[in-house]
């Protein structure tokens, strides 16, 4: 069964309507999961800080399930991800209240806090207060663009999986996901960015819904995400103090992978340029140096990305370090 949000409030002062929304859903005793910087949006509700929760405490989840009738995640990626985990374990509906828009986790059923990520349930409702989101750090909002443009290469990888591996593919989910990315790219390239936060949130919610339709992360996560996870692995391996965000890394990965698809003749060069220019338009990094990684790390990440998880992509069985360098140079990442 496909579960997608029943309600989406995406407007200025939307958070003020949260009590009304809960009443409409007949939810009387929610538990809020939030952070210390976002607890101010939890007034009137019982709350727990996300970093005080043991996500492996099954007994605790059962207790929450008995005491509360719903879970609300208020904040960025971690409170919302942990809210999904608790919702999934306690069998209670989840309401997503993002305070920024850096990735499509605000609406998707994917829990990415743990690796490998896994499918839980989509939020029953999303309350996105544009006044709050507009005031969030610009770095987070530009990262959101990176997560959206990645739908372009993710869908190409999914189509490749269908062609080369006879993988199950959903036309509706694939088209929906790709269209969301194309529309946001066209917006940031052709209009002023006054409405960018609202457009971005709508796109991220749509991307999350495409995942729910497919019951897979395939429409929004391909080789560009493998590259991002490979960068994360290297940050851990070498204990690097690089403050790069998931969406920023995925945006850079999308530039790289779109170059590879251009060279295979599956997209035109105009698409590659649009991806890069849309990221530039929102001040997202488009080179490894701006992201904080040197050439050797980028080459190691790209040549090892195919090992991150078992998923057929244009990386296939992997790139040599020589080929990785060539692609990085052609895409002007290094």
Curated annotation (Swiss-Prot):
It catalyses: sn-glycerol 1-phosphate + NAD(+) = dihydroxyacetone phosphate + NADH + H(+); sn-glycerol 1-phosphate + NADP(+) = dihydroxyacetone phosphate + NADPH + H(+). It is an enzyme of class 1 (oxidoreductase). Disulfide bonds: none annotated. HAMAP family: G1P_dehydrogenase_A. Catalyzes the NAD(P)H-dependent reduction of dihydroxyacetonephosphate (DHAP or glycerone phosphate) to glycerol 1-phosphate (G1P). The G1P thus generated is used as the glycerophosphate backbone of phospholipids in the cellular membranes of Archaea. Its cofactor is Zn(2+). Pathway: Membrane lipid metabolism; glycerophospholipid metabolism. It comes from Methanococcus vannielii (strain ATCC 35089 / DSM 1224 / JCM 13029 / OCM 148 / SB). InterPro entries: G1P_dehydrogenase_arc, G1PDH, Glycerol_DH. Keywords: Cytoplasm, Lipid biosynthesis, Lipid metabolism, Metal-binding, NAD, NADP, Oxidoreductase, Phospholipid biosynthesis, Phospholipid metabolism, Zinc. It comes from the Archaea. GO terms for cellular component: cytoplasm. SUPFAM superfamilies: Dehydroquinate synthase-like (SSF56796). Zn(2+) binds at residues 147, 225, 246. Belongs to the glycerol-1-phosphate dehydrogenase family. Its main location: cytoplasm. Substrate binds at residues 104, 147, 229. This is Glycerol-1-phosphate dehydrogenase [NAD(P)+]. The gene is egsA. Its EC number is 1.1.1.261. It is found in: Cytoplasm. One of its GO terms (biological process) is phospholipid biosynthetic process.
